[in-house]
């Protein structure tokens, strides 16, 4: 079925910044997709096109990206004899029209908006759920419900506190189903709120961009202590493990790391990568930490390889790999990490996201699907994680509607699958 009409507009993300939304029409109806936006972005991500007009939205407008869709991509796709089922063909057409390596001409936010809408329309055209359509595109006969990684303590670039490390997550791997994992996660979240309130006062329970609490603590170990305490109080010590996103590129300075980077600069406190690695090993020894994302800077390749070789935990590449096949290939060759963080807007199309996922999985890596800190109510990544069978997703705390929208969609999918629903659980790293 051919595309009848495509219309893009500016909408707002969860931080009050403009982002791109695309409406795509076929004979089956309207299919709408919205594009997320990150705060701690890797320098190798595909280009997110902003207007840079300082008189409007502090330069963050996306009128140019919207214009490129409405005036270039839309007419080209509506005039093509392609059906919305042909995801790869449509994505390739847009990539060829852009003609640059990092989507410099139209912007990844323009191409992705259309690509996501096409994916939704393709599922409707086939008369199957979106997760099944994505599984078909990826060549997966089965589908799997993921373990949610709830980001319940926010630091780094996501919060106004002194905490350097960006995310402290709980993963209910001992749950019996996705719905059960949600209940466990929510109960720990509420226990954590009480633990923080008792120790630091009510102000400390304000939340960050992803719905996690942002108490004004400096010591990263203190965040882990708070988590351990809340997990124990909720009664789930045997069912929950901990994950972290350090986002170390945010505090990498001149070859070293500044764990107090939000304070006035003082080079005497910077530490080298091996000292930082020792800190992580201490966390793993003292707490149930099983996953660490971006432990080092995106170009500190040697530190990555050294650390990954020395540990059995999951080491996740985000800023390092930016969902980009070339960076993933280098990471595989150098054994830099053992898990890919998959963010559709880092690469900028559904087809390339699927290719990145397949590449990581075929290299023996795990894959974790991820939201961005600037999110919308769009829930496509919920269907994506189920269809790609990655076994793990991070999309914030069980708080803030743009986060819950994804988790609620996953509960609906599990309900729809009924007896056929498989939950990744303790096999979240390699669920297939």
Swiss-Prot record:
Transmembrane segments: none
Family stated for the protein in its record: Belongs to the enolase family.
Binding site for Mg(2+) 2: 245, 293, 318
Cofactor list: Mg(2+)
Protein name listed in UniProt: Alpha-enolase
Task performed by this protein: Multifunctional enzyme that, as well as its role in glycolysis, plays a part in various processes such as growth control, hypoxia tolerance and allergic responses.
Gene3D superfamilies per UniProt: Enolase-like C-terminal domain, Enolase-like, N-terminal domain
EC number of this enzyme: 4.2.1.11
Localisation: Cytoplasm
